[in-house]
Amino acid sequence: MSDTELLKTPLHALHTELGARMVPFAGYSMPVQYPAGLMAEHHHTRAAAGLFDVSHMGQLRLVGADAAAAFESLMPVDVIDLAVGKQRYGLLLNDAGGIIDDLMFVNRGDDLFVIVNGACKHGDLAHIVERIGNRCSVEPQFDRGLLALQGPQAVTALQRLVPGVDKLVFMTGGAFNWQGADLFITRSGYTGEDGFEISVPANSAEAFARALLAEPEVKPVGLGARNSLRLEAGLCLYGNDIDTTTTPVEAALNWAMQKVRRTGGARAGGFPGAARVLAQLDGTEPLTRKRVGLIALERIPVRDHTELQTPGGETIGEVTSGLLGPSADKPVAMGYVSPAHAAIGTRLHAIVRGKPVPMEVSAMPFVPNRYFRG
């Protein structure tokens, strides 16, 4: 895809002005890093506040009296009981229980506000419309940008521009206003830090981003550091760590499936692939692989698609994401291994350029999460 065919976010001119190195991502021209570089951007986010352009992601509204029940029929997640103002992580599944996409949704009272991955948004929209378009109105929000402000000082900076955001706690959201622009802000993100995601009208996005960058705590952060931050936080990247061939149980996302949708729950099953997913949850269908955290015992980064073996040379899985964790200060990774080798502390070998690198199965996150829960 040439530059001329790449889509541009509302902040494209600002990225260029800031000296960003732009790369193709999910069909958009996106900043992978700014002149400060990935390491500096990563550390700044963990210490202060980083501003990310995530406008490539899909935003949509589901509207109508039946919207919650309809949306719940697509996911192994409790949508119906989600209180107004609360946000939840969700998983769209196919009929084999594979993950079509992971997403976030908020009950805003008069609608469900949904944020999906950029590379999946057109497919997700078609899937949602096909499955539940007759039960509720599905309205893409193409005219809005999306910013993420992440880090321990995010609240300090954002509160100056948007008073009242400090009242939000992790996984809640609310409507705010900035210079006449209607904002919808959730206290959430994908870095493991406290922070916010801000939906803003596209025609106000650049001015709002400039106002945030004028705050002393805030610096721009690109996709490179976004990736290292989310991996240290133990969070999946769709297309790398989860895809249509992985089930939520294989992906160790059991926590995302509430009790009410599980065997014995009041609304058990009733989602695509339920028979398989519930059998895996209940242990009646044994898993063949499981997502785990991994730490390299030598200072050698272990990248995606690296083969994992037992010390005896038997292939038992592969790495799906891996890099030298800037805050962890060691090579961290996640990947899939056979369940017999998934216990924390299990020693494995990653085969890097033909040589075995010793690794150990580790708990995640690799860096403690610092979400603000009130």
Language-model region placement:
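Conserved, structured C-terminal
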Residues: 1-26, 30-34, 107-374
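Internal amphipathic helical hairpin motif
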Residues: 65-99, 154-181
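Conserved thiamine diphosphate
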Residues: 102-106
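Acidic, proline/glycine-enriched N-terminal capping motif
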Residues: 1-90, 98, 223
